[in-house]
């Protein structure tokens, strides 16, 4: 008797009176086909390491950039985002840090061809899947461009049957996703703490002389002077002090003060800066397929407004993808997309620029007004109809004077200045598949990416450092960037099965890539019309510049795969690559990989283990190259690192040159040695499945800048010296707990643990201090911190104490001198987390669906620079953290917060005091939907209707309120805050 069922392996059993038959899952019938380098492969035959995210997960995320959807979804993939501005990429790192000075960015491949356009130009609704290739066996064929991993993006295509029309719409609200730090917002408390800082310094010696009344009077006078706070926002009776002898606010003080011309009252700068805004998105697609043709076309619109004024991202997108079986032996495909986007942002985001609105929201003290008010307390309006903003500079607006962000008002800049990026991205691909003879096929892929961006920045002529009163009269800058790239692939494949058990798959080919970049910039001052963002609108101090960059690679590639009876698998690949980044003598490099797999579940000794659906062992090793050397500082790529590069200037009408970059003709490929091994498994009919893998990624001949003597005429020199390794384990689990007609419930979990270690360094770099906090040393992580060790305060004086590495000549183990402490650095922890990953669950029942996803990391450390700024005991107008209320006083000696003292310039220096845990738990997404019964929708001539609610970036739990460790590895402060989006929507299928 033959027993069969869909998705289960057919069994033939003898006929008996009573039978108890258990069918095993048919892993061949349910074989998953995955996208890999230059094609597809059965998951069971794949010997490398890869993970796939399907459209179902991508579509739930409300993001203008698909890289943000990777957070917590894939083992071995870590994302950080130091800019929450809509449209911005997340920084993606796959299996650790591959280089010190070269890029760690992965390669993006869209529909088989490397992609150079903006990732934000790809609509998430067009994406069918994303596959992350993590080891050399899976991505070595991409050569140098795949050294840091590869992310394959596959767009949707039509399905057989009648044409399908899909429309979905989302409407929602964007709001700030991370709260403020817990700062002192009460003006009275703010004055009291600043008073104590000045009083404790006893600048005139009155307190030491016992004249406490004079000490009090002087501290009040100094506090309100332009040297310190510079603003009075309380009214007090004539002859009385704002702060009394007890250090507390005068009980007769009332909030609000007028000097006869202006009225001063504090504003909450964060409340004034941040706003809730609308988000809307619409997508329409039409798709279908016949025996000879497959087509998919789509159009989309996204308006993703930001959470600060005049910021956001707007996108219009369209895609047409079709293939046609021209002849029995010839199939051709065309795939073209066009995107126009407008990004509104400020270039001051990040850092401590006076125009950075996020810096202002963090650091502005609790007493300062945002606006200028007349004597009656009304916000004033200038003769152009603009609100008058307080710049903290007497004579420009009010009579107040502040040291925190002087002569600037970031909100005014956002309201009055205009900055915009407009881009057009065209991505086209043409391919032909030719069936030559008896398993031999040829494939041609040609991809072209064109990216044109125009940026305009206009600084208003009315207020601030470029105002008419400052002698400038406004500024206009316009730039144009154009990139053009062509990728050509010519491939030959042979696929054949012999005697039903020997399967051979061979690939050989040639690939070339050409990239051109052009930049043009112009700037002028003194604007005629503040509403016209064009160069012709300015007449003074004209300046301009332009340059171009060219880059090319060429590669010959080969891959062979063999499997026996679907049980034993071996693979090997080879690529010979050339890069224009290197001198012709060092241009070519050879890279390869080997891999093997064993599908144990098909062996006879396991065939009776009904609980094992699939069990596979895999192992691989390979070499890859990296040519992506960055300029010192890591912001821009150097396309000519083997050449000396100069800047040209005007010297009294003659040419003047200066060495900008010292090249090295001997540098060549940085090489990554990748090892991977592990198991893929599925048990109990899909109740539990996943993978566990061990990886090692060793980088040799590292590209980095070696320090040299100043007498050489330059400070650093690029070389191939040193090595580094990342080793770790990955665990990826899923469980289909319940699966039936009306109800399903599944959960997923992934975890990555890895360690970074520098194995070899040039003697000149070994032990060198990096960015004031890290030291590169052999046998340690490149992110190992070395900081002075803060051990609290002297209980009798309230002064800061730091530890000594070894006792001094008097046997002291601590010091009050920061200069001494700065020479006594301790290993203070590793910035890299020990564990990171994500987990989630989804439930469907009777038309309802609910999914929840989380991301987390554990075991790392982060420098909280914002908290450091908020804990300055010598602050003169900057915001103060609530922890300052714990500062040492004679009545509060049991504390680790030093005594307030305006003269203490060292307590706030960088030490391990400002090092905190980077652990976090983030509720990434909640999606709740309901699909109407088909019996109802068919009456409306609609195939399907789904209504849904989606919330992104819902909650974040960290070691300190306001801290967001997701912004960067080392630290990221004063950057665009992450956005929380809450939306509702509808999806229609016809």
Q: What is each of the regions a protein language model found here?
A:
Residues 376, 828, 839:
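Aromatic-residue-lined binding/catalytic grooves and analogous aromatic/hydrophobic interfacial grooves
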Residues 1-319, 324-327, 331-333, 339, ...:
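Short, small/polar-rich motifs associated with maturation and membrane association
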């Amino acid at each position: 008797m033959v027993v069969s069922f869909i998705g289960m392996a057919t069994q033939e059993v003898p006929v008996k009176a009573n039978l108890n038959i258990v069918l095993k899952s048919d892993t061949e019938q349910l074989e998953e086909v995955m996208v890999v380098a230059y094609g597809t492969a059965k998951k069971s035959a794949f010997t490398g390491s890869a993970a796939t995210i399907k459209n179902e997960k991508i579509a739930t995320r409300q993001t203008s950039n698909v890289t943000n959807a990777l957070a917590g979804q894939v083992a071995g993939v870590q994302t950080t985002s130091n800019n929450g501005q809509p449209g911005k990429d997340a920084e993606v790192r796959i299996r650790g840090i591959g280089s010190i000075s070269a890029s760690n960015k992965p390669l993006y491949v869209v529909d088989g061809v490397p992609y150079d356009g903006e990732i934000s130009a790809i609509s998430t609704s067009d994406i069918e899947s994303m596959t992350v290739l993590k080891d050399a066996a899976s991505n070595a064929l991409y050569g140098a461009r795949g050294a840091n991993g590869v992310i394959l993006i596959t767009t949707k295509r039509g399905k057989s049957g009648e044409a399908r029309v899909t429309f979905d719409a989302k409407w929602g609200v964007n709001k700030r996703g991370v709260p403020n730090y817990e700062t002192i917002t009460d003006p009275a408390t703010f004055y009291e703490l600043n008073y104590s800082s000045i009083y404790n310094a006893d600048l005139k010696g009155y307190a030491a002389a016992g004249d406490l009344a004079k000490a009090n009077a002087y501290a009040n006078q100094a506090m309100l002077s332009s040297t310190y706070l510079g603003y009075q926002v309380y009214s007090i009776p004539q002859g009385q002090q704002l702060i009394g002898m007890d250090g507390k606010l005068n009980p007769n003080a009332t909030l609000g003060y007028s000097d006869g011309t202006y009225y001063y009252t504090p504003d909450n700068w964060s409340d004034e800066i941040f706003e809730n805004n609308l988000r809307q998105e619409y997508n329409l697609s039409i798709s279908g397929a016949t025996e000879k043709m497959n087509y998919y076309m789509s159009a989309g619109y996204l308006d993703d407004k930001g959470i600060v004024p005049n910021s956001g991202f707007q996108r219009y997108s369209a895609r047409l993808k079709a293939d046609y079986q021209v002849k029995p032996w010839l199939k051709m495909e065309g795939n073209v997309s066009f995107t126009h986007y407008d990004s509104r942002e400020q270039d001051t985001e990040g850092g401590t620029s006076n125009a950075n609105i996020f810096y202002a929201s963090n650091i502005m003290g609790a007493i300062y007004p945002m606006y200028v008010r007349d004597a009656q307390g009304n916000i004033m309006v200038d003769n152009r109809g603009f609100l008058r903003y307080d710049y903290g500079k007497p004579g420009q607006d009010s009579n107040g004077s502040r040291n925190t962000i002087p002569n600037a008002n970031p909100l005014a800049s956002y309201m009055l200045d205009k900055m915009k990026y407009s881009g057009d991205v065209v991505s086209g691909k043409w391919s032909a598949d030719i069936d030559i003879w008896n398993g031999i096929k040829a494939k041609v892929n040609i991809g072209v990416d064109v990216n044109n961006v125009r940026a305009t920045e206009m600084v208003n002529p009315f207020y601030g450092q470029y105002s008419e009163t400052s002698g400038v009269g406004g500024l206009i800058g316009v730039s144009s960037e154009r990139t053009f790239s062509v990728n050509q692939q010519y491939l030959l494949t042979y696929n054949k099965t012999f005697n039903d058990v020997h399967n051979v798959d061979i690939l050989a080919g040639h690939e070339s890539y050409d990239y051109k970049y052009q930049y043009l910039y112009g700037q002028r001052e003194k604007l005629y019309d503040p509403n016209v963002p064009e160069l012709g609108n300015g007449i003074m101090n004209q300046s301009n510049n332009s340059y171009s960059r060219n880059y090319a690679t060429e590669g010959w590639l080969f891959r062979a795969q063999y499997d026996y009876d679907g049980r034993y698998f071996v693979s090997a690949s080879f690529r010979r690559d050339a890069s224009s980044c290197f001198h012709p003598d060092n241009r070519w490099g050879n890279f390869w990989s080997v891999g093997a797999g064993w599908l144990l579940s098909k062996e006879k000794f396991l065939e009776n283990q009904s609980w094992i659906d699939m069990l596979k062992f895999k192992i691989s090793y390979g070499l890859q190259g990296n040519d992506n050397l960055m300029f010192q500082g890591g912001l821009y790529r150097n396309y000519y690192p083997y050449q000396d590069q100069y800047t040209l200037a005007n010297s009294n009408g003659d040419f003047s040159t200066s060495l900008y970059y010292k090249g090295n003709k001997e540098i060549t490929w940085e090489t990554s040695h990748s090892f991977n091994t592990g198991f893929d498994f599925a048990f109990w009919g899909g109740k539990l499945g996943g993978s566990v893998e061990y990886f090692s990624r060793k980088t040799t001949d590292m590209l980095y800048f070696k320090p040299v003597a100043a007498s050489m005429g330059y400070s650093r020199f690029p070389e191939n010296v040193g090595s580094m390794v990342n080793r770790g384990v990955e665990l990826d689990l899923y469980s289909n707990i319940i699966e039936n007609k009306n109800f399903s419930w599944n959960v997923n979990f992934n975890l990555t643990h890895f360690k970074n270690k520098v194995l070899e360094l040039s003697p000149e770099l070994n032990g060198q201090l990096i960015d004031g906090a890290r030291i590169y040393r052999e046998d340690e992580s490149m992110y190992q911190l070395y900081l002075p060790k803060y051990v609290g305060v002297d209980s009798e004086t309230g002064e800061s104490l730091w530890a000594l590495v070894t006792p001094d000549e008097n046997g002291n183990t601590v010091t009050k001198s920061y200069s001494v402490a700065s020479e006594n650095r301790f290993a203070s922890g590793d910035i890299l987390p020990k564990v990171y990953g994500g987990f989630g669950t989804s439930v469907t029942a009777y038309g309802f669906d609910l999914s929840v996803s989380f991301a987390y990391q554990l075991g790392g450390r982060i420098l909280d620079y914002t908290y450091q700024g908020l804990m300055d005991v010598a602050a003169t107008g900057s915001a103060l953290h609530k922890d300052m209320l714990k500062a040492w006083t004679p009545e509060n000696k049991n504390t680790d917060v030093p005594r307030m003292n305006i003269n203490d310039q060292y307590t706030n220096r960088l030490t391990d005091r400002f090092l905190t845990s980077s652990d976090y738990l983030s509720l990434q997404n909640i999606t709740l939907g309901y699909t109407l019964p088909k019996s109802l929708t068919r009456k409306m001539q609609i195939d399907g209707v789904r209504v849904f609610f989606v919330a992104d970036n819902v909650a974040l739990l960290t070691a300190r309120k306001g801290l967001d460790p997701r912004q960067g590895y080392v630290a990221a402060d004063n950057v665009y805050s992450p956005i929380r989006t809450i939306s509702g929507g509808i999806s229609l299928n016809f």
